């Protein structure tokens, strides 16, 4: 199996400034330090939709792992469980969406 990633999609929070502070100052450092076995951590802020409308989501994080087994092992650790609980606590616009994705072959351009 190819590498996998955990994608976390955060709904638009009730208080964007507070969410941003908590996310940048607390959550990202926690994820970087406490989730074992990851190969990369990427965070992006959603600017809007292609039509220019406000997006229903505010942030998307991607945590990369070399295999599904590595992700599953990481998810069972206290550090990952604490990070997941923190993600849920700071997501004031509703619960975050957690997706597991398998990387596919690149598409030639």
Stretches found by the model and what they are:
Residues 1-109:
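Macromolecular interaction modules
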């Amino acid at each position: 199996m190819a590498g996998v990633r955990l994608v976390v999609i955060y709904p638009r929070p009730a208080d964007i400034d507070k969410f941003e502070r908590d996310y940048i100052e607390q959550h990202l450092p926690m994820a970087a330090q406490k989730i074992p076995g990851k190969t990369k951590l990427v965070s992006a802020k959603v600017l809007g939709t292609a039509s220019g409308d406000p997006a229903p989501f505010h942030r998307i994080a991607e945590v990369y792992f070399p295999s599904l087994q590595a992700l599953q092992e990481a998810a069972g650790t206290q550090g990952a469980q604490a990070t997941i609980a923190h993600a849920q606590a700071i997501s004031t616009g509703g619960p975050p969406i957690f997706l597991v994705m398998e990387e596919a072959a690149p598409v030639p351009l």
